[in-house]
């Protein structure tokens, strides 16, 4: 090859290499520009139209780093559209309950600044569970904790923390309330907060951190609500509220709420005679509540709520092993599904149960007369057969030598089914423990399991002699 041919060959190769490099740079530039603009677009699965990310609620902001040769491109992955919860999955099949959480608030109060509370409950958004309680406007090691046995003061507020985090000084005070309920509709939290004078209280409806609606007392006798989670189906949330006598006829209404706005109010109908402090759970396409009859029955009222047409029905749990306290012993207790049993009906305690086909799972104090101990079990035929008493799968949650209190249900949606969980309030202090002047609580939480489980007891555990007076 002569010199001229060498020069031509080298030049041709160089030109080809330069052309390839030029085309690569153009490809990189096009890719960079495309990815840059695509970070502001999302494909809608419904109609394949391009929609801006901006109006979509972002639950988690995920950043993906893409490396192309020496160029770094930062691309935001658009989140999926947040939707209302519909709770349409079936209920999980369980064999019993397994330990889930315990906050040890009273034990921690012996050496730290922990709120004085009562009326706790648990509720979950689609990704995380939270514990709530009504604070008394004071910590335990504080002279303001004296005489906190009283239920209704203007200083009480609804507290909210992640489940398992005790109510420390940094805890968020969601609203002013001496009675409350909370639930998440899939997009935001709804809080129902009752406060004010006994004869003229106000219920505030707070949605997504904003006051949206309110309603005043309709019977001028302690307007009150569930003290556990409400339930939202396809954007409509239901909450049971009562105003009137705690030991006689009262006026119960079921409120239907959409994004904090009251859209309908239905009166209680059916055979339930007295309804308070309902523990509600989704039973698609409706909502079912197990409540407290503080007037006539130690068997628990059932309230069925139709979310679509706002209709209401009520009855009583059929199980002859009844769930309220005080109650008759199991040999002499009765329940025939439709009416209160007129057995030690005056007074009571908040509790829960849920149907499982024809059977019923339930929890109650071990003591028949006081808020001591706690047990759960399943009653065969307890949902459909009057006065059924065949008990299986009994578990002790708190032994009979230790105090319990209110209890309630909450629901957790899994990949294939909806699990039922419950909490137990572990009350300490006055009236029973007179060495101290305060009344407060901790909680223990269990959830349904399809596995095996052992035995134990999970009381509050604080030594009252080590506690601030």
UniProtKB/Swiss-Prot annotation:
Q: What does this protein do?
A: Catalyzes the removal of terminal sialic acid residues from viral and cellular glycoconjugates. Cleaves off the terminal sialic acids on the glycosylated HA during virus budding to facilitate virus release. Additionally helps virus spread through the circulation by further removing sialic acids from the cell surface. These cleavages prevent self-aggregation and ensure the efficient spread of the progeny virus from cell to cell. Otherwise, infection would be limited to one round of replication.
Q: Please state what the protein is called.
A: Neuraminidase
Q: Which cofactor does it need?
A: Ca(2+)
Region spans: Hypervariable stalk region: 36-88
Signal sequence, renumbered to the chain: none
What's a GO biological-process term for it?
A: viral budding from plasma membrane
| Residue ranges, Intravirion side | 1-9
User: Could you confirm whether the keyword RNA-binding appears in this record?
Assistant: no
Q: What is known of its domains?
A: Intact N-terminus is essential for virion morphogenesis. Possesses two apical sorting signals, one in the ectodomain, which is likely to be a glycan, and the other in the transmembrane domain. The transmembrane domain also plays a role in lipid raft association.
Entry's Gene Ontology molecular function annotations: exo-alpha-sialidase activity; metal ion binding
Q: Which reaction does it catalyse?
A: Hydrolysis of alpha-(2->3)-, alpha-(2->6)-, alpha-(2->8)- glycosidic linkages of terminal sialic acid residues in oligosaccharides, glycoproteins, glycolipids, colominic acid and synthetic substrates
List the cysteine pairs that form cystine: 92-417, 124-129, 183-230, 232-237, 278-291, 280-289, 318-337, 421-447
The residue ranges crossing the membrane are: 10-30
Q: Which EC numbers characterise this protein's activity in its record? A: 3.2.1.18
Positions glycosylated per UniProt: 61, 70, 86, 146, 200, 234, 402
Question: According to Swiss-Prot or TrEMBL, what is its membrane topology?
Answer: Single-pass type II membrane protein
**What PTM annotation applies here?**
N-glycosylated.
Major localisation: virion
């Amino acid at each position: 090859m002569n010199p001229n041919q060498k020069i031509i060959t080298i030049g041709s190769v160089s030109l080809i290499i330069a052309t390839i490099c030029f085309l690569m740079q153009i490809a990189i530039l096009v890719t960079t520009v495309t990815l840059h603009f695509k970070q502001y677009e999302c494909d809608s699965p419904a109609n394949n139209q391009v929609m801006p990310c901006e109006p979509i609620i972002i639950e988690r902001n995920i950043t993906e780093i893409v490396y192309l040769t020496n160029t770094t491109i930062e691309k935001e992955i658009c989140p999926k559209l947040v939707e209302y919860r519909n709770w349409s999955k079936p209920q999980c099949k369980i064999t019993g309950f397994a330990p889930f959480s315990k906050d040890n608030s009273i034990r921690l109060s012996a050496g730290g600044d922990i709120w004085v509370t009562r009326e706790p409950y648990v509720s979950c958004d689609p990704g995380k569970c939270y514990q709530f309680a009504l604070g008394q406007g004071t910590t335990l090691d504080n002279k303001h904790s004296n005489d906190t046995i009283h239920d209704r003061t203007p200083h009480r507020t609804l507290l909210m923390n992640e489940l398992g985090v005790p109510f420390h000084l940094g805890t968020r005070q969601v609203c002013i309330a001496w009675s409350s309920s909370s639930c998440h509709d899939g997009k935001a939290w709804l809080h129902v907060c009752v406060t004010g004078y006994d004869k003229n209280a106000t219920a505030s409806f707070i949605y997504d951190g904003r006051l949206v609606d309110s309603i005043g007392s309709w019977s001028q006798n302690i307007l009150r609500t569930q003290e556990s989670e409400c339930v939202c189906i396809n954007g409509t949330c239901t909450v049971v509220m009562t105003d009137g006598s705690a030991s006689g006829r009262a006026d119960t209404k079921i409120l239907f709420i959409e994004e904090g706005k009251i859209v309908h109010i239905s009166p209680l109908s059916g055979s339930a005679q007295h309804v308070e402090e309902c523990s509600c759970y989704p039973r698609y396409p409706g909502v079912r509540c197990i409540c407290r009859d503080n007037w006539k029955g130690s068997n628990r009222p059932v309230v069925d709520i139709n979310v679509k047409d706002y209709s209401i029905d009520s009855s009583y749990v059929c199980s002859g092993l009844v769930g309220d306290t005080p109650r008759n012993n199991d040999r002499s207790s009765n329940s025939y599904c439709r009416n209160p049993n007129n057995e030690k009906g005056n007074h009571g305690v908040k509790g829960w149960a849920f149907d499982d086909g024809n059977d019923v799972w339930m929890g109650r104090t071990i003591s028949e007369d006081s808020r001591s101990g706690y047990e759960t079990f399943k009653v065969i035929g307890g949902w459909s057969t009057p006065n059924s008493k065949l008990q299986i799968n009994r578990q002790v949650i708190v032994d009979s030598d230790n105090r319990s209190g209110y209890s309630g249900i909450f629901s957790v949606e899994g990949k294939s089914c909806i699990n039922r969980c419950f909490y137990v309030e572990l009350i300490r202090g006055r009236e029973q423990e007179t060495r101290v002047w305060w009344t407060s609580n901790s909680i223990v939480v269990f959830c349904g399991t399809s596995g095996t489980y052992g035995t134990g007891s999970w009381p509050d555990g604080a030594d009252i002699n080590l506690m601030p007076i």
